[in-house]
């Protein structure tokens, strides 16, 4: 397995519940290192740009509305097989279908307010990381 970087968002619902530390602890306990992090209240333009791939989907407006409803925590995580590991830790998109002990099973309320976002592939991770973090803001995790 190779060391990878992945992008993570702790979404407004989880920030509002004050579970940021609990979520980050899950990442770190499972071998993922935080190599970049910032809290930000996304503008509508930032959220629309980030989720542009979903622009023509019926849920796009609700997704953008939710993502601008409060602050988020943007992070770059690094570790062995980081993308798959993060997706396993997050659990299924719908928290009702997420395995017990996953972030979404423990902290998410609904398929919309589902606590976290994580990249799904190396190419996606690279684009998502670059969207919010210039290279100078991402530090070597070794």
Swiss-Prot record:
ATP binds at residues 11, 59, 87, 93, 104, 114. GO terms for cellular component: cytoplasm. InterPro entries: NDK-like_dom (IPR034907), NDK-like_dom_sf (IPR036850), Nucleoside_diP_kinase (IPR001564), Nucleoside_diP_kinase_AS (IPR023005). The keyword Lipoprotein does not apply. Keywords: ATP-binding, Cytoplasm, Kinase, Magnesium, Metal-binding, Nucleotide metabolism, Nucleotide-binding, Phosphoprotein, Transferase. Its EC number is 2.7.4.6. Its cofactor is Mg(2+). The active site is at residue 117. It catalyses: a 2'-deoxyribonucleoside 5'-diphosphate + ATP = a 2'-deoxyribonucleoside 5'-triphosphate + ADP; a ribonucleoside 5'-diphosphate + ATP = a ribonucleoside 5'-triphosphate + ADP. Gene3D superfamilies: Nucleoside diphosphate kinase-like domain. It is found in: Cytoplasm. GO terms for molecular function: ATP binding; metal ion binding; nucleoside diphosphate kinase activity. GO terms for biological process: CTP biosynthetic process; GTP biosynthetic process; UTP biosynthetic process. It is an enzyme of class 2 (transferase). Homotetramer. PANTHER family: NUCLEOSIDE DIPHOSPHATE KINASE (PTHR46161), NUCLEOSIDE DIPHOSPHATE KINASE DDB_G0292928-RELATED (PTHR46161:SF3). Major role in the synthesis of nucleoside triphosphates other than ATP. The ATP gamma phosphate is transferred to the NDP beta phosphate via a ping-pong mechanism, using a phosphorylated active-site intermediate. HAMAP family: NDP_kinase (MF_00451). Belongs to the NDK family. This is Nucleoside diphosphate kinase. The gene is ndk.
């Amino acid at each position: 397995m190779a060391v990878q970087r992945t992008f993570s968002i702790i979404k407004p619902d989880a920030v509002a519940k004050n579970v940021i530390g609990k979520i980050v602890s899950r990442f770190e306990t499972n071998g993922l290192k935080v190599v970049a992090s910032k809290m930000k209240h996304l503008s509508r333009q930032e959220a629309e740009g980030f989720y542009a791939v979903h622009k023509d989907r019926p849920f796009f407006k609700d997704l953008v509305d939710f993502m601008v409803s409060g602050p988020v925590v943007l992070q770059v995580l690094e570790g062995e097989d980081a993308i798959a590991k993060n997706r396993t830790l997050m659990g299924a998109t719908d928290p009702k279908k997420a395995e017990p002990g996953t972030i979404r099973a423990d902290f998410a309320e609904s398929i919309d307010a589902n606590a976290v976002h994580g990249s799904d592939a190396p190419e996606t991770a690279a684009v998502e990381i670059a969207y919010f973090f210039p290279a100078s803001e991402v530090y070597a995790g070794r």
